[in-house]
Structures are given as C-alpha cells and as structure tokens.
A protein has these predicted regions:
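Key DNA-contact positions within bacterial/archaeal DNA-binding proteins
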Residues: 58, 110-111
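Long cytosolic C-terminal regulatory regions of eukaryotic multi-pass membrane proteins
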Residues: 131-134
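The short coil/loop that forms the "turn" connecting the two helices of the helix-turn-helix
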Residues: 55, 107-108
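Conserved short loop/turn motifs at secondary-structure junctions
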Residues: 103
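Membrane-proximal linker segments that couple transmembrane helices to downstream signaling/catalytic modules
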Residues: 2-100, 116-119, 126
Length: 134
C-alpha cells in the first residue's frame, strides 16, 4: 500500500514545484515589463522576453496563463492601457492627441489602441478622456 501512496504524492509535488517555478517566472516577466516600461515598445515580443530571461516562449506563455489566465499580449496591453489612462488623466500630456497617447503607451496603431481600450473599458479612449474633463 505504501508504494501507491508514493505514486500519488510525486505528481502533486511536481505540480507544486512547477507552479512555484511558474510564479517565479511570472514575477520576473512583470519586473522586466515594468522596469524601463518595456511595454511601451510595440515591437517587444514574447520571444525577446524569453531571451532576456533565458527561457523559451512556451514557458513565458505557460507562466502567464497559470498566473493570470490570459496570454502575453493581454498582459502587455493591460500595462499599456493603464499607462494610457494615467496619461489621459495627467495635465502633463494634455497637449497630446488621444492617438498619440496610445502610441506612446506602446500600441502599434490607433486601431490597436481603440480596440484594446474599448474591449476592456467598454468605452472609446476619446470618450473616456472627454469624461475626465471638468
């Protein structure tokens, strides 16, 4: 009976080990994205992230999926959207168009910005910005 018990414990241990490694990698991804605001570079790919962290894109994807339920692009876009919202709220960026703010936040085009923003906030960036005006 003892052998059966051990057989059951090993996979659980492996899963726990895997999830700890996955959590660690996720934290490294977060740090890498936020340090120097790498998400502002529209060309910064999961592959580049993998190279920096000395891993591969499969592990990057798995770590993000395990910790957020989403994928690399969703995660990067969340940072970009948060950044864009902050810029729209700040008088420092009042001279920029909504499109320019989207590009500065790291979106590759106006369309990409509007689509991601509308999908998450259910409002266009322009309408959001107008709603901020006193």
């Amino acid at each position: 009976a003892m052998n059966e018990k051990n057989d059951k414990e090993i996979p659980a241990y492996r899963t726990r080990l895997k999830s700890e490694r996955s959590d660690r990698l996720y934290v490294q991804i977060l740090e890498e994205l936020t340090r120097n605001k790498r998400y502002r570079d529209p060309a910064f790919t999961a592959r580049q992230m993998a190279e920096i962290l000395h891993t591969n894109t499969r592990y990057i994807s798995a770590a993000i999926a395990n910790c957020t339920g989403g994928n690399y692009n969703m995660m990067v876009n969340k940072f970009r959207l948060r950044d864009a919202c902050r810029m729209m709220q700040s008088p420092r960026y009042a001279h920029l168009t909504t499109e320019e703010i989207g590009l500065l936040a790291g979106f590759s085009s106006r369309q990409a910005f509007y689509l991601a923003f509308s999908r998450v906030y259910d409002i266009t960036p322009r309408a959001y910005r107008l709603g901020l005006k006193p």
